[in-house]
Amino acid sequence: MSDSTQMEANAAINEIKKRTRKLDQSLQMRFCADQFFIGNHCTKLASGKSIIISQNSKNRICLRFFMAADPLVGYTGRDFGIAFNQIDHISLKDEQQENPAVLICTLNLSSYTKMCKLQTGLKDVVEKPFLYNKSLARNLTFILKPWNDDPDTFVKISYNDEHREYVHSYDYDVAKSLMFKEVQAVWEQSLKEQLQRRHQTGRVYLTSQLSEMTPREWVQFLADQKLSKIVCHNGSIQYARVEDNPHGRKHTAVATNGFDHRGTRVLNSFGKAHASLATQEKSYAKKRKLTEQSLKLIYRNDRSVWLEGSCAKNLKMPKINSEPNMGEFMGWPDMDNAMTHPTSNFENEDVMKSTKQPNDFVSFEQLQAPPPVLQRQNGAIYSTQSVAFTHISGNDGVEDLTEKISHLGEEAYNIDMANALHAFSDNWHYEIHPNTVHNASFEQLHIGDGNSSIGTIGFNPLEPYPQSSFPQSNNWQQAHGDFTFPQVSFPNTQQGSCLPSTPTAALPPTRPVVEKIPPDTQLFTFPPSGSCTTGMDPVVLLVKDIKTLDRKEFLNDSVMAFMLNYIAFMLSSELMKSVHMCNTFLFVNLTRLLPPLCFSKRRPIEPEHIKIVKDNCPRVLRWTRKFDVLAKDYIIIPINEDLHWLVIAVINPSGAIVDMSNEEASRAAPKCYIVFFDPLSGLDPSKKNHMCHCIKIYLAQLYENTKAPGMKFASKNPTIYDEERVVVTRAENTPIQDNFYDCGLYVLHFIEGLFCYPNRPVNVNDFPNFDWSKFFPEANKMCDLMRDKVYNLILQQADKPARSRLAKFERENKCGLSREGALRKARRHSAVNERRTKRHRDYYARHYSLSPPHRNVMNDDPTFMNPRGLAEMPITRLVRRLRIPEDNFPIAY
């Protein structure tokens, strides 16, 4: 082949590649984002812009999105195009009932750094919530939504052919299939070529860069990213960042050997800047432990004010007179002249409990240093300057001496101790004299070798002590000149450490700050990991959810969802396959924009109302599109409307389907029953008619979209849906609540009673004349104990740290059933006879018992008639026996 022919062939190949590349670049996958998070910072995409996956000009597959202007991260929008080679991992999450679909991209470090450089302020805003794991800030989370009301429009595939653009819409399953089959193959090939260009030899094993996220992994991802789910008024789901907890950082406890329980410890940290003292440590946890233990001021204001009596290990102190007693107060200005300074002995009384007289003050020039045997505590050496007391005589008695110095401990809180403290290393040198005199305007606190400092505010005393020579002057520096500072030495402090200037904190409190448990603290996730949970979404229980189990409180949806999962989890595997537990959002989304009680049969049913329900059906049908719901024997639908819990059980939903190939036998089979359970049972059927009619429309739409001929779960034989075979009923003699706040507990009893009967579950053969009292004769008593039962089940599922957090939260907020039980224990220890064993301190005396009153006396109004009392009235029983049509009765409530 001649050279000219070869050149023509290469030109033709290049032209084909160019056209192919151009055609490939026109192929795009477009997603519509409802929310966009960088880390856990919520921002927005530009108006009208979407998420695009396509090939760039270099024929590399890339992710492209246009970020809108955000005042926190830059006032200008920016178009980002990130090649897949710069992405570590991509996760896809399908819709799970009310939870939307999600696309998560984890950037590698280089692409994240470039993105932060392009967008001013992005790094500071995104990394601020993730001090311990900044890699979480590299997650791009896109909350997806359909392009329109049709749920099958999650992704748009567009391409150009002969200068014409074609656009097709598909559901999320098609988008996921394209990502795993097409995009992943191109992505892996691109990574292999990149490794070959870098001349890396040997076989390369590439791990999967694309994965599907399970519901449990999504719950854990939200917890790691500090995001919380918010249910909007229209039933949609939004996500928001959890507010930063002011008590989130836990202080490192300081050892208290030698302290009694009456002492009060106050720990003050110098701030975040003190972390620079431990920059040589490899672990952040080690840095934090070192800095928190070494840079905290410890104040004592009780009888145990003196530190533990032990000298520095390798430091020989000269003896003065004899071994000092516990009440001996002594000191010296330096090592050479230690014997020339007098000492004073006094009784170590509680100096804070004496009454301080007005105008009492002691000058720091007149204070004597504490004894050396009281210098070391928790590895820190404390020393103060030595100035003799002018108002204390060695001949004074204990009472006189105590009266004279009783103001010292209290007066120490009238100044900022940080202004009078010098910190130096454990092995301080003798040439650094403790009696070094500083000017009164001294504004630095020295650390380590004395060359490093942090800024403080000058000392400003209140008023002079009456017996001292301290002159009364507003300017203490002019009147008194120089004064000395007490000194504090911290061990293991790095030499030459430097801390920035910080303003002096407020006066130290008299008791340590107690860290409270925030209400959003997570307890556990149910069902447990590793269990077979097909069709069961995990539920995260928070501390605030358990508070709804208190007396006279309404159960929230989290506790209800936990119990639904628990009941389903405890069923046998065969029975579980025939049960579908809907979540509490199904009926809310099904009746969105629907007028209240429009199907109550008290007014004509309008076609537009039926159309509203049918339009809402695709939203909830997406949640169960992966399995055949009508093939189940039980469909449990919990409902919360107007702060009231109800439940509807669809028994034998396939009974509404007629097999036309054997119509006679099919119509002779058991029908479909919609059983309505209302613990606030009255004579008015309006709510029952309205809710059950909505469920009938839902079942009809469910058949048309899943079981009709040509659908995904259609039968081989021709079938039709017969609405006449759907019977609305209610069980007889069901328990009725005797208050207006236990409705959720009764609903749990109804759901549990359908499956947990000792002999067998309730089946379709028990209807329509099903008597609940025959199965559960003591149903009312069982419902009254349901609150304690749910609480105990939660404690069983929680581990020990979770139970500890819950108990602490209940003590802080004075709530919880466990607190009520602890208070009732006092009655067990109220025996008349003398005790042989000492009463435990957790048990209170009888007159301190706060047990709640009996249920019969809890009603404020003695004439109050509860729902159960109304249903048990003789006139009510007579009306029910007459079986007068319910539609003729007026509204009872």
UniProtKB/Swiss-Prot annotation:
Assigned EC number: 3.4.22.-
Chief localization: nucleus
Active-site residues annotated for this sequence: H644, D678, C743
Stretches assigned to coiled coil: none
Inactivation phenotype: 64% of embryos arrest in between late gastrulation and epidermal morphogenesis with failures in embryogenesis occurring during late gastrulation, epidermal enclosure and elongation. RNAi-mediated knockdown results in arrest in 29% of embryos which display a range of embryonic abnormalities including increased bulge formation (humpback phenotype), epidermal enclosure defects where the ventral cleft fails to close during embryogenesis, impeded or inhibited ventral neuroblast cell migration and irregular cell shape and positioning.
Keywords, comma-separated and alphabetical: Cytoplasm, Developmental protein, Hydrolase, Nucleus, Protease, Thiol protease
Effect on the protein upon substituting C743S: Probable loss of catalytic activity. Failed epidermal enclosure during embryogenesis
Gene Ontology MF, one: deSUMOylase activity
A Pfam family per the record: Peptidase_C48
Subcellular location: Nucleus; Cytoplasm, Cytosol
One GO term describing the cellular component: nucleus
UniProt xrefs under SUPFAM superfamilies: Cysteine proteinases
Family: Belongs to the peptidase C48 family.
Function: Protease that catalyzes two essential functions in the smo-1 pathway: processing of full-length smo-1 to their mature forms and deconjugation of smo-1 from targeted proteins. May deconjugate smo-1 from the cadherin protein hmr-1 and plays a role in its recruitment to and the maintenance of adherens junctions. Required for epidermal morphogenesis during embryonic development.
Entry protein name: Ubiquitin-like protease 2
Name of the gene this protein is made from: ulp-2
